[in-house]
A protein has these predicted regions:
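C-terminal target-recognition/interaction regions appended to catalytic cores
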Residues: 68-209
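Class I S-adenosyl-L-methionine
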Residues: 1-102, 106-108
């Protein structure tokens, strides 16, 4: 078992962790190796704009909207800002009793910046405690923007209502992370079957891409 930070491979979520459990039989004397850390941190711009990870800007798609009052409040928050960037009277009104409690509460009224990774996505894009507002437009991320942040290919289709699609994406492990875990398992299996004098590796990692 190993705790993997999502920075281990090109993903776009900030400070996310996943408990990855890979079970190996005790009678197998080959050591499984988890994916090695990746030396580059990708930001939101890498997810939503044409560049190294994607060959086009994020496609347009449906998404949630903010109620007018929340939109009016978030209009006042700059990129990479949150509730502390609001005027004090609006802070108190918007935060309610939470204003007087301890803790940073940095997810409230949070607008993501282009030059930072996204915060961990939840199953709902507009929860008050875990706000993820678009950098330029005062709205939640759309379904396809959500999917890009989780490194889903643009061809991946989600089913159900908009809220169900958000939930599917929010519950997912980032695709690139899952792929790297898969490659590490393929490497282990190839070593195992090679040791058993198998003429052919069980799986070709080239075919698994």
């Amino acid at each position: 078992m190993k705790l993997l930070n999502f920075y281990c491979r090109p993903t776009l979520k900030k400070n996310g962790s996943a408990c990855i459990l890979v079970g190996i039989r005790k009678d197998i004397d080959i050591k499984y190796q988890y994916p090695k850390p990746h030396n580059k941190i990708y930001n939101l711009v890498d997810a939503l704009k044409k560049g190294e990870l994607f060959d086009c800007d994020v496609p347009k798609s449906a998404g949630s909207d903010y109620p007018q009052h929340k939109k009016d409040v978030l209009d006042l928050v700059p990129p990479k800002g949150y509730w502390r960037n609001l005027p004090i009277d609006i802070q108190k009104e918007y935060m309610g009793k939470s204003f007087y409690l301890g803790g940073g509460k940095t997810g409230i009224a949070r607008r993501i910046g282009w030059d930072e990774p996204s915060l961990t996505l939840t199953c709902s894009p507009a929860q008050k405690q875990t706000e993820r507002c678009h950098p330029d437009e005062t709205r939640p991320f759309t379904v396809r923007e959500y999917a890009r942040i989780q490194t889903f290919p643009d061809t991946w289709e989600f089913s159900g209502s908009i809220s169900q699609q958000y939930k599917q994406i929010g519950n997912a492990v980032p695709c690139n992370l899952g792929k790297e875990i898969g490659f590490s398992i393929i490497k282990f299996l190839n070593e195992y079957y090679s040791k058993l004098n198998s003429a052919e590796p069980l799986i070709s990692s080239a075919k698994a891409v």
